[in-house]
Amino acid sequence: MLTRRQATSIFGATALASIGGLDVVPSRARAADPTPADLAMPGPLGDVWLGSQDAKCTIIEYASMTCSHCAAFHRDTWPKLKATYIDTGKVHFTLREFPLDPLAAAGFMLARCAGDDKYYAMIDLLFDKQNDWAFVKKPVDALAALTKQAGFTQKSFEECLKNQEIRAGVEAVRSRAGTILGVDATPTFFINGKRYDGEMSFEAMDKIIAPIVNS
């Protein structure tokens, strides 16, 4: 069992309390849209892509697992976006980690440990059940119970969260996004290199994507 002391050393004390829906980090001057080369560079763990790499439209989302706006996007917009544009090969999509707190980092670590083929299934599960683990008195215990639905055992859960290589990889993506790409809030989207901040409806995204894919 992961003791409270061990959990604190992994996540930090903040993650063991009830964590609110933080969705911003300390503000800085808004950066210009990044260069294609800067935006294309993956983190140490690599990107997990969905859709066709030959698509005319590429979307990169930066999200945090404890961000309520991110969860709302994945609940309300993501299913239709995926069915309409990603599954049909019109959009190439990846989600990159931008954890706003240690518990969010833990969620991303578990998604990485699930493997590339189950990465988005884990992301969807954690967003769908966000209120059941992110904002409760014992979030680590709740997270452990939830991930059993994805095939984790208590042992594999603990081993994943002690994996410093994965932890460092997740944090590297967040750090680079903040310093190089100017990301300072979640969710943040880059659609063909142009930045859009905040939760987006399908209708808002459709107005941007449709002219690109139909050109």
Task: Label every model-predicted segment.
Residues 12, 127-131, 162:
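Short amphipathic alpha-helical surface patches that mediate protein-protein
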Residues 50, 56-64, 68:
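Mature N-terminal segment immediately following signal peptide/propeptide cleavage
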Residues 63-66, 71-148:
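Structural alpha/beta surface segment adjacent to cysteine/selenocysteine redox centers
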Residues 16-20:
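Hydrophobic h-region of N-terminal signal peptides that target proteins for export
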Residues 1-15:
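N-terminal secretory signal peptides and thylakoid transit peptides that target proteins
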Residues 2-6, 32, 64, 145-215:
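C-terminal cap of thioredoxin/glutaredoxin-like
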Residues 22-55:
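C-terminal segment of N-terminal export signals and the immediately downstream linker at the start
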